[in-house]
């Protein structure tokens, strides 16, 4: 049985630049720092950076595939400021259907990986669908609503 996400790994073109970015934006120091790898914990999740300087990174910028980190709404402005200071590519927000979806900031790291900080929760999203589109809820039990 799968117990959760073990870790995420991103290939990076410049280790020093990537480490500086993640350290500044997420206010976390690396746990492991080598010439070709770095490990962080962000919100309790293990993030690994591996040096791969020769990968074509053009296509990565065309996908909505991303990782979203939870953040308190009261912390959004400070986080946005850190993104600006780090020189992040901050993207326009995705249009939300309703306020209950939470607020987000989408941004790219120096290698083009799409990241998001998001204030909403799965429980809030499920409650929204339960009220507005109950036919969309399939295989939902009380455990999933927590």
Curated annotation (Swiss-Prot):
Could you name the Gene Ontology cellular component terms for this entry? cytoplasm
InterPro entries registered for this protein in UniProt: Fosfomycin_Res_Enzymes (IPR051332), Glyas_Bleomycin-R_OHBP_Dase (IPR029068), Glyas_Fos-R_dOase_dom (IPR004360), Metallothiol_Trafse_FosB (IPR022858), VOC (IPR037523)
Chief localization: cytoplasm
Q: Kindly state which keywords UniProt assigns to this record, in alphabetical order.
A: Antibiotic resistance, Cytoplasm, Magnesium, Metal-binding, Transferase
List GO BP terms, alphabetically. response to antibiotic
EC supergroup of this enzyme: transferase
Q: What is its EC number?
A: 2.5.1.-
The cofactors required by this protein are: Mg(2+)
Quote the record's binding site residues for Mg(2+).
7, 66, 116
Question: What compartments host this protein?
Answer: Cytoplasm
Which domain of life, per UniProt? Answer: Bacteria
Q: Specify the VOC domain's residue ranges.
A: 4-120
**Subunit-structure text:** Homodimer.
NCBIfam families associated with the record:
PRK04101.1 (NF003152)
Describe the task this protein carries out. Answer: Metallothiol transferase which confers resistance to fosfomycin by catalyzing the addition of a thiol cofactor to fosfomycin. L-cysteine is probably the physiological thiol donor.
**What family does the database annotate?**
Belongs to the fosfomycin resistance protein family. FosB subfamily.
Output this protein's name.
Metallothiol transferase FosB
Origin organism of this chain?
A: Shouchella clausii (strain KSM-K16) (Alkalihalobacillus clausii)
Corresponding gene? fosB
């Amino acid at each position: 049985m799968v117990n959760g996400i073990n870790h995420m790994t991103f290939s990076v073109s410049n280790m020093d630049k990537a480490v500086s970015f993640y350290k500044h934006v997420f206010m976390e120091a690396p746990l492991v720092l080598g010439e070709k790898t770095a490990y962080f914990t962000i919100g309790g999740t293990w993030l690994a950076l591996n040096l791969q300087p020769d990968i074509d990174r053009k296509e990565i910028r065309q996908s909505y595939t991303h990782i979203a980190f939870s953040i308190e709404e009261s912390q959004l402005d400070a986080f946005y400021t850190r993104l600006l200071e780090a020189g992040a590519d901050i993207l326009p927000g995705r249009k939300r259907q309703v306020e209950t979806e939470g607020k987000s900031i989408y941004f790219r790291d120096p290698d083009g990986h799409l990241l998001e900080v998001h204030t909403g929760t799965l429980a809030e999203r499920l409650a929204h669908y339960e009220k507005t589109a109950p036919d969309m809820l399939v295989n939902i039990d009380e455990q999933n609503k927590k």
